[in-house]
Amino acid sequence: MDEMKRYGVVNDFKEQMEVVLLRGTGCEWAQCNFCDYCIDHDKNTEADYQLNAKVLDKVTGIHNKLQVICSGSFVELDSKTIEYIHKVVTEKKISTVIFEGHYMHRKFIKFMRLIFSGINLEFIVGAETFNLFNREAILNKGMGVASPQSISKYFNRTNLLFGWKGQTYESFLEDIELGLKYFDKICINVFTPNTTKFERDEKLVQQFYNSTEFQELLANPRVRIIDDLNRDITDTFDLVGEKWSKIGGTK
């Protein structure tokens, strides 16, 4: 796992920030049918901290913004890592920190705001889709009947999963509309084949890339499009997480 790229810098017209991929004790949900990203974890919290500290030592504060991602949610980062993040953020005068989390951990967000008092915190949720049947019966996200409006009360950013067999273009466009209505920023992660049984719908993906919607979204500063198989025409994330399968959907 340690051969992954865990530090990067995003610097384009959409956003400027440093990104770190840390390691936690493991996604507490870990039941999403499309995701094998959760294999990057270790129950040994001291080992996690030692690895995470080395990654965090690379942070310079160049853009005053830091995004912290992991294989699950912020609650699965050990306490020493959280303390070290706070130390680095304070020393580097970083004004905004972005964490990711599963909807099931929404009630812990208020405690993070207390810990990082005086620092602007933003939170990403991997809603993947707002189609209730697709989200719960097919993707098995474990978010119950939560609506985009209720989700946005806790999270100001969302990841959307696109390009898997069984999804329709119409439902995808509805996801985009709802995402832009209720969230500050959305990230469209185009499904990349991994160790799960989910398959990429290349016909659907190409329909998107040949559409006016794609060009409009690519030019929208609130939207990031990531496709590991088409990096030349989509946005980048500085290859953080490179070296093994990562479909991009957060918890």
Where do the protein language model's features map onto the residues?
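C-terminal accessory extensions appended to soluble enzyme cores
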Residues: M1-V9, T90, T192, E199-K251
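Core AdoMet radical
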Residues: Y37-N52, V59-S79, V89-K107, N120-A146, ...
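Surface-exposed amphipathic alpha-helices with a cationic face
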Residues: H86-T90, M112-S117, P148-K153, Q215-L218
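Short, electropositive alpha-helical surface patch
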Residues: T81-V89, T168-I188, F237-K251
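Conserved C-terminal portion of the radical SAM core fold
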Residues: M143-R200, Y209-D232
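Short, flexible/disordered intra-domain loops and linkers
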Residues: N44-E46, S79-K80, A137-L139, Y169-E170, ...
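Distinct, well-ordered alpha-helical segments
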Residues: L77-H86, R106-F116, E170-F172
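Canonical Radical SAM [4Fe-4S] cluster-binding loop centered on the CxxxCxxC motif
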Residues: M4-Q50
